[in-house]
Amino acid sequence: MNMLQRRLEDPEVLVRLNAFFLSYFGWVAFGVLYGVIGRWSVDLTPQFLRLPLTSRDLVVGLVEFTKGVPPLHALFTVVYYLGFAGSIALIVAYLLLYLRDLEASDRLLARYLMAYAVAGSIYLIAHIYAPHIVYNLPGYTSDNTLLTRQEFVLPSLHNTFIMINIITLWKYRKRLGGKVLILTNSLIPFATVFLGHHWIYDVLTGFLLGIAVSRTSWEWGARISAGIYRWEVSSLQRVTVLNFLLAVIVLIVAADPARALAIFGGLLGGP
């Protein structure tokens, strides 16, 4: 607890935490705006389905196999629902709050920003839909949320970040925390395919994008304005708390939009 308290009183750590929050909120905002700016994106799903390893039999077979092994299904479900945001939160907490590796966190942020930019540009040009959408698998939602859009499939940004995470964590592979995080991240690609959320090609292109971004930015680090460091620690702490609460609200709304809006409406005294 004393270490966590010290980290949360460290302006270097607080500034970087808020930078990660803001980059994530930027991606959420892009997803919301995509409903408007993505109208000209070309749907290449029919052409994509001509490729091998995209058949209904394969997709349904993998999903049914996974469901037929309850421990495996439970493991993959937990790993998958750790989610995009969860995988980011864990590695940021490990690098910043536990290790205070400022250099690694700066490189991680730079890689995330590049991945957001490249993947977002691709989705604006063309997109495909996920296996569970294409084959209308029962038990899956086709609704867009604050965290996901059904067009954001190839390359899989989730798997891009997984590769970035593993590459960034690799120097800590002999530490227990590093081993656990690398193992957890390594399971996520399998979960996305075996649960029908992604095609095999999504994972592979996501990996390639993650490797390309990491190699391109190998010596880069995100630069943060020096003026922010002149803020008082108490001000940085308040901004951090605000961003944390906003992130929690985003997750709650994304999990069950209708229920979340009903709750917020009740709290605000709405009808």
Predicted stretch roles:
Residues 26-36, 89-93, 242-256:
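Hydrophobic core of alpha-helical transmembrane segments in multi-pass integral membrane proteins
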